[in-house]
Amino acid sequence: MSNYAAGLGKPGSGKRRIRDLLNQPDNRVCADCGASDPKWASANIGVFICLKCCGVHRSLGTHISKVLSVTLDEWSDEEVDSMIEIGGNASANSIYEAFLPDTCSKPGPDVNHDQRMRFIRAKYELQEFLKPSLRITSGKGSTKSSAFLTSSLSRKIMDSFRTNSSSQTMFQEGMVEFIGLLKVTIKKGTNLAIRDMMSSDPYVVLNLGKQKLQTTVMNSNLNPVWNQELMLSVPESYGPVKLQVYDYDTFSADDIMGEADIDIQPLITSAMAFGDPEMFGDMQIGKWLKSHDNPLIDDSIINIVDGKVKQEVQIKLQNVESGELELEMEWLPLDQ
């Protein structure tokens, strides 16, 4: 169980307790695609999800994912307690995505239905990213058999949460403690490299630890405008965000169109030094300086803007003949 969810286990209105859990920073985005402001939940899995992912979860059947509306449906005490005990998206994803391979990217909010379906099935129904000792497999069987297996899996995972809550460790191979969330808005690219006959079909991939997120593909566009938000959980021991741009190819491997390491330490250090940003007016609180060994085009300023800690970043893509990228980062502490 995540530390900040522990206090939600006290008696009270079920819907109020669920709403309180939903308001935690890591639950403000969909557990599966990162879409903002999810209003649905899988009560037996313990995650908050968006409307599009909700449709896929429903198609899996209630024996795999029991979907409830946070605001419209009635929740039983058992369902509420289960959600509280798991602690929300960050805790659940550290289990269900513990062994997410580098070759598999989480879908973004705007992916097509087929991509969304493939990822969610692999994550929950096929259990492809679970720790091997938690996986439960069977041959072809009935829905009743599948329901039993999924129930057994849920019990094993819940037992693991209970056991590790007391020891303060949770699946050392896959579970980490998070210190906050990093919202990255990929704004636009400029003069990107040509990888097809006369253009490219670019998309951006972000990597942090075991997390891998990507934007939508922009067809035949060397100056794409995404304005797409991606949300990363930041562990206690973090490194730079690895950014890569690829050209999407239908019949062959996607071609690299440049890369860059984004140093997030200046943002996090500045944010933690000032504490609650809502106590301050708009002001500059830090800076990531341009140097010969980083991809910055200009110094990157860190500001408090409307009670939020944000950083504008303009980078020149590395190891490629041309291309620049503009993005914005925002820091969201877990205790916000």
UniProtKB/Swiss-Prot annotation:
Ca(2+) binds at residues 249, 252, 255. The keyword Calcium applies. Keywords: Calcium, GTPase activation, Metal-binding, Zinc, Zinc-finger. Residues 162-280 form the C2 domain. A zinc finger (C4-type) spans 30-53. Its cofactor is Ca(2+). CDD domains: ArfGap, C2_ArfGAP. GO terms for biological process: pollen development. Signal peptide: none annotated. The keyword Protease does not apply. GO terms for molecular function: GTPase activator activity; phospholipid binding; zinc ion binding. InterPro entries: ARF_GAP_AGD11/12/13 (IPR044518), ARFGAP/RecO (IPR037278), ArfGAP_dom (IPR001164), ArfGAP_dom_sf (IPR038508), C2_dom (IPR000008), C2_domain_sf (IPR035892). GTPase-activating protein (GAP) for ADP ribosylation factor (ARF). This is Probable ADP-ribosylation factor GTPase-activating protein AGD13. It comes from Arabidopsis thaliana (Mouse-ear cress). The lineage of its organism: Eukaryota, Viridiplantae, Streptophyta, Embryophyta, Tracheophyta. The gene is AGD13.
